């Protein structure tokens, strides 16, 4: 938990999920403060759009202006809602929209936290292009090291004239004025053929490894089990290639695709529809914080390629939460399979949670682990 006085109001903010007290990560950064410093409240005429507000620092500070919080992270929405409540601000003050939704017309102010991927930034800038005017104040912010020439060129190409500020507390801002430059249309998804399958994999802008199969998933797919039945989960599904493979290998199983990214879940749904339409009725698609709210003892198996970062921050909190949720939701003798970089040492974490862990396969970079939910552990 951390305190910030941004000039609009004094706030107490926390990350979601919370980090441990030994290695705490802040729920806000200098770029949030810098954005708010540059914003004169007298300029706010018309809707306020906030993009990629990781834990609600901007939304909480500007709550009295009824902002729209736009992004592709259910975790960020949950974190923002929790911080609104914690600071005594009505959740209804903020309207939450997915990045692929229609944005409000003629906004007075647009604040953008520059996302990690240029593809997501381009998708969002193209969406803004349809609604902003020459009078819209457009300001983006990030750590100075995360603003590159390619970032500025993208703003110029999609929206118009772009300038940057001096660095402050290692943060930098981008100011942009909409001038309606000529711009060719772009497809909503990026597609590629998955070798040895005949499948075409479709990827929305914010999907991990959207330009091709990542090497961890490739290794995982080589060792997925067969002859499973009942309900199984592709947890943190991304574009759904693991779940697709499980559907093909296990015709008696139903697969639940889960991710905190709406774009990932939409990509998974599209990939089942286009590649295995006959298996679509065996699928469920869920935008969720891991398996929050899912009943215990439901699944026969969970498959997971856990992230070790949240936006720009390195953290194993999300993976840790995924493992605990998986154990709670597995049936007795249900199995959790994960693939991970070897250096993360998830073997001992799983053994601590499940009381057991076995190595299924390993190579010079990745390891595939299996843990079984045993009846004698609660």
From Swiss-Prot:
Annotated localization: Cytoplasm
InterPro entries: DNA_methylase_N6_adenine_CS (IPR002052), rRNA_m2G-MeTrfase_RlmG (IPR017237), RsmC/RlmG (IPR046977), SAM-dependent_MTases_sf (IPR029063), Small_mtfrase_dom (IPR007848)
Main EC class the enzyme belongs to: transferase
Annotated keywords: Cytoplasm, Methyltransferase, rRNA processing, S-adenosyl-L-methionine, Transferase
Biological role stated in the UniProt entry: Specifically methylates the guanine in position 1835 (m2G1835) of 23S rRNA.
Gene name as annotated: rlmG
MF-aspect GO terms: 23S rRNA (guanine(1835)-N(2))-methyltransferase activity; nucleic acid binding
Lineage, top ranks: Bacteria, Pseudomonadati, Pseudomonadota, Gammaproteobacteria, Enterobacterales
EC number(s) from the headed UniProt entry: 2.1.1.174
Catalytic reaction annotation: guanosine(1835) in 23S rRNA + S-adenosyl-L-methionine = N(2)-methylguanosine(1835) in 23S rRNA + S-adenosyl-L-homocysteine + H(+)
Family note: Belongs to the methyltransferase superfamily. RlmG family.
GO cellular component terms given for this protein: cytoplasm
Highest taxon, organism lineage: Bacteria
Protein name per Swiss-Prot or TrEMBL: Ribosomal RNA large subunit methyltransferase G
Location (main, coarse): cytoplasm
Keyword Chaperone: no
Pfam families in the record: MTS (PF05175)
